[in-house]
From Swiss-Prot:
Organism whose genome encodes this protein: Autographa californica nuclear polyhedrosis virus (AcMNPV)
Protein name per UniProt: Uncharacterized 36.6 kDa protein in EGT-IAP1 intergenic region
Basic and acidic residues bias: start-end ranges: 17-26
Annotated region described as Disordered, given as residue ranges: 1-34
Superkingdom of the organism of origin: Viruses
Length: 316
């Protein structure tokens, strides 16, 4: 049975303790400031009061690599597109490899982040929804239909229910950053006078049990990393000579993990590692509200157009 896992938080880097001052292109002072064993670029306004910090590129030192948890090592490899660190020896291994291939053919959001916000790259285009669709597709210009971006992150998932049926509500570490990126692009495209606010989570539909084929297609995206199949990695805390072995989650474990027999209320939040894609921004059913002049106005809720890739439950 799948169990919850515990992961550590991030990693740090070190640099020498001597501040370095440079001149930016705009003539502003930039200083690499030693802080919490890391380095930051800082820009000041004309008064010198406002300080804008951004992390400089981080290079891990050998002594820091020894402190890295294997979960962090896995995440770094996947984030850089090295899916070979994950292996599935079961029958579903072919599906997993095909999914990794699909993600590899998309744009990496990890590589594009800095080119999308605050000013989007000049080659970014927005394809408006048509034929009853509700998604603004956002991506780099290509010869053909633009495609979205893939990403990976740690997050949580829980089963919930609405008037339209059951669904999974998903949150992950960078979701607010992604909301800023894609919300900003769409706001510029729509030339709206008001800020565009995005929903704080993403949702995917959970088919009913009587829709067997649709449900199986979703369940086959869930995998388990457990101690039994990764003994040396759990024992040493490092991924060295063999990749992580993942097993497809059984239907029984899936139903048990997400408390499918529970009638009222959502299931418990489950921690997981995920891969998925963002095609752009989608909108929902219009809402009606009243302004301070008692005028009726309508707005649409916006959220990331998320599609699931792979979900990995890591045994503690």
């Amino acid at each position: 049975m799948a169990t919850k896992r515990k992961i550590g938080d991030g990693y740090s880097s070190s640099d020498d303790n001597q501040p370095k001052r440079e001149r930016s292109e705009g003539g502003e002072d930039q200083q690499l400031v030693p802080y919490n064993s890391g380095a930051f670029n800082v820009k000041h306004d004309e008064t010198g009061v406002m300080c804008y910090f951004t992390p400089s590129s981080i290079q891990l030192e050998p002594h820091e690599l020894t402190k890295m948890l294997w979960q962090e090592q896995m995440a770094i490899n996947v984030k850089r597109g090295n899916f070979s660190i994950l292996n599935c020896s079961c029958f579903e291994g072919r599906f997993l490899k095909n999914e990794f291939c699909r993600l590899s053919n998309l744009n990496s959001l990890h590589e594009w982040e800095d080119k999308l916000y605050p000013e989007p790259d000049k080659n970014i285009v927005v394809l408006e929804p048509a034929n009853g669709k509700t998604t603004y597709t956002i991506g780099p210009r290509v010869q053909g239909k633009p495609c979205g971006f893939w990403f990976s992150d740690f997050g949580t998932i829980k089963r919930a229910k609405s008037n339209f049926g059951q669904f999974f509500s998903i949150q992950y570490g960078d979701i607010h950053k992604h909301n800023n990126i894609f919300g900003n692009i769409l706001q510029k495209h729509l030339q709206s006078d008001f800020p565009l606010k995005m929903e704080p989570n993403v949702c995917i539909h959970l088919p009913d049990k009587n829709k067997t084929s649709e449900r199986d297609m979703l369940i086959r995206r869930f995998y388990i990393i457990n101690r039994d199949n990764n003994g040396s990695i759990y024992a040493t805390g490092k991924i060295r000579n063999v990749p992580l072995d993942m097993q497809r989650m059984s239907v029984e474990d899936f139903d048990r993990l997400f408390e499918m027999d529970k009638i009222d209320g959502p299931s418990e939040e489950i921690k997981m590692y995920m891969m998925g894609t963002i095609d752009g921004v989608k909108y929902g059913k219009e809402m009606q509200m009243t302004d301070m002049n008692n005028k009726k106005i309508t707005e649409k809720p916006y959220s990331l157009a998320f599609k699931p890739g792979i979900f990995v439950i890591i045994e503690q």
